[in-house]
Amino acid sequence: MSTSVPVKKALSALLRDPGNSHCADCKAQLHPRWASWSLGVFICIKCAGIHRSLGTHISKVKSVDLDTWKEEHLVKLIQFKNNLRANSYYEATLADELKQRKITDTSSLQNFIKNKYEYKKWIGDLSSIEGLNDSTEPVLHKPSANHSLPASNARLDQSSNSLQKTQTQPPSHLLSTSRSNTSLLNLQVSSLSKTTSNTSVTSSATSIGAANTKTGNRVGEFGQRNDLKKSILSLYSKPSAQTQSQNSFFTSTTPQPCNTPSPFVNTGITATNNNSMNSNSSSNISLDDNELFKNVWS
């Protein structure tokens, strides 16, 4: 949050005052940029540190450039206007020789500030300050919004009166509209009840039809299952008398095999005998040939 423009202008105007050209306590530093806004004096940074050591119950310090200022912080500064007028109150009973003395030593400066503000040794009377309560030009210029306040208040009064009249006396056209609205609401309620009854009837009819179709489908499924069972059981049932007689007829008409010997068996036996005879003759020939060769080589 930054300092508003009117407050900045007021601070700059106070600092331009010739009475604020020196520090209010040490009188040695020029152009002070700090202030004790609770005491209403402009001081240097060295004296500001001593003021802070006293505590906020005695002195509240702010920087002109670093801290945020509000209108309430300027009340005491505007009341005294400058350091000369403030010292005429805080140093009223101090000797004239000491009033203009410049203090540079830190310890002596601390004692002086404590005696001046904490112990209030030299404090005077506010009524003795010249022009302190006179009506001078205000340093902080506020926007002239008070002139427009009566007109705005009159408008607010008129609007409030009109609102009260409308609340106390309801117009006739509002009553007629309310009656028409109630009749319309009754018609809408009746139409809604009829539509709900019709929808309930149709929904019940559709539910009954769906139940009938489901039962018909179940009956058809049971019939198909019974047919399948019958066809399967017929495969495993005992044969009837007609099938037994037919089987006996087919068995009686089939021819029985005879025990006559086949000529193929004898022919096989004779062929084997001939083969054995031929092998014996060939073996005899081979032996004779060997004997001939033996005679030749011998």
UniProtKB/Swiss-Prot annotation:
Modified residues (N-acetylserine): 2
Gene3D superfamilies named in the record: Arf GTPase activating protein
Keyword Nucleotide-binding: no
A GO cellular-component term linked to this record: cytosol
Subcellular location: Cytoplasm; Golgi apparatus
Keywords from the named record: Acetylation, Cytoplasm, Golgi apparatus, GTPase activation, Metal-binding, Phosphoprotein, Zinc, Zinc-finger
GO biological process: endoplasmic reticulum to Golgi vesicle-mediated transport; intra-Golgi vesicle-mediated transport
Coiled coil: none
Major localisation: cytoplasm
Zinc finger (C4-type): 23-47
Keyword Zinc-finger included in the entry's annotation: yes
Role this protein plays: GTPase-activating protein for the ADP ribosylation factor family.
Identification of the protein by name: ADP-ribosylation factor GTPase-activating protein effector protein 2
Taxonomic placement: Eukaryota, Fungi, Dikarya, Ascomycota, Saccharomycotina
Gene name linked to the record: AGE2
